[in-house]
Amino acid sequence: MGGEAGADGPRGRVKSLGLVFEDESKGCYSSGETVAGHVLLEAAEPVALRGLRLEAQGRATSAWGPSAGARVCIGGGSPAASSEVEYLNLRLSLLEAPAGEGVTLLQPGKHEFPFRFQLPSEPLATSFTGKYGSIQYCVRAVLERPQVPDQSVRRELQVVSHVDVNTPPLLTPMLKTQEKMVGCWLFTSGPVSLSVKIERKGYCNGEAIPIYAEIENCSSRLVVPKAAIFQTQTYLASGKTKTVRHMVANVRGNHIGSGSTDTWNGKMLKIPPVTPSILDCCIIRVDYSLAVYIHIPGAKRLMLELPLVIGTIPYSGFGRRNSSVASQFSMDMCWLALALPEQPEAPPNYADVVSEEEFSRHVPPYPQPSDCDGEACYSMFACIQEFRFQPPPLYSEVDPHPGDAQETQPVSFIL
């Protein structure tokens, strides 16, 4: 629906003033796109106007303190911490009075004034409203009239800075592991360990995040694993920082008794409709994280937190491996261990590679030395000739003389 303002009172001669976008079904705009629409004006009788203009504005503001709504110190108190960044400032004239006359007369009836403008090609931060600041864009039509206050109508313009979750940094799997000793000093009851992995860093609204985790409870307490998505808002103003953090979604696991282990093989946590990550504004930032934590009675909770990016362009699945993360995740958490290489394959037999004919062609016969005579000398060189170009011994995994070897222990590598 378009914005509309009416004029009442003895001097009110404008019945309505409205602002309508050309594509009302378009939810949001991005940098470089065109915004089009028209201003609707209905006059009950002839109206004298100085002009009709259109304003498009966009800015990010962050402020807090005793005078957060003002830019000056009031009553000697502390000045407000405030900062502002301008993204859009545009003014268009839709109706002007003839030169030298100052006013124009608008006849009774309905009038329509089209407008069209392009958003800047530079990155525009996503629209957002938070506790200590906002990023807002608006379009306003202002009707200038002589001897009476200006009349205006305003429409919000939703802008989004697209984040593609198919970029390589956002397709990287995330994993962490941590252990906590329950108790203190000599009264420890054993450790609680937690390992967590997710398939990628980037997700979109409405997606469900499969969580892979293993919880091992070696303490004497009954523990409960939980997972949650947190939104963190960071505001910068006058060199100061404010942070707001709250939970947007959560899921709970089963109780884990002492000496027990629980595994999450893709436990789903759905992302609710939230503002996409805001990473390109210098005074307001919106980040997300996935926290998997364990509530331990009588002790601080054990928590692992993995960063998330909530994007706007969903995962395409292109180039996805056939095997899922679930197949790589087992009960013994094998993805945390360094896998040893497979046993090497035996090399081929030398005789299978080099034929006797080729051997004779490339190896000339040894001449008999002049200072050696007799059958013994010839036999010696014949032996050298026979074994000089022999292939190496065949590969064998079994020692043919095990009696001379000492027993060795197998070697394992643990991360």
UniProtKB/Swiss-Prot annotation:
One of its GO terms (biological process) is protein transport. Its main location: other. It is found in: Early endosome; Cell membrane; Cytoplasmic vesicle. Coiled coil: none annotated. InterPro entries: Arrestin-like_C, Arrestin-like_N, Arrestin_C-like, Arrestin_domain-protein, Ig_E-set. A motif (PPxY motif 2) lies at residues 392-395. GO terms for molecular function: ubiquitin-like ligase-substrate adaptor activity. Belongs to the arrestin family. This is Arrestin domain-containing protein 4. It comes from Mus musculus (Mouse). The gene is Arrdc4.
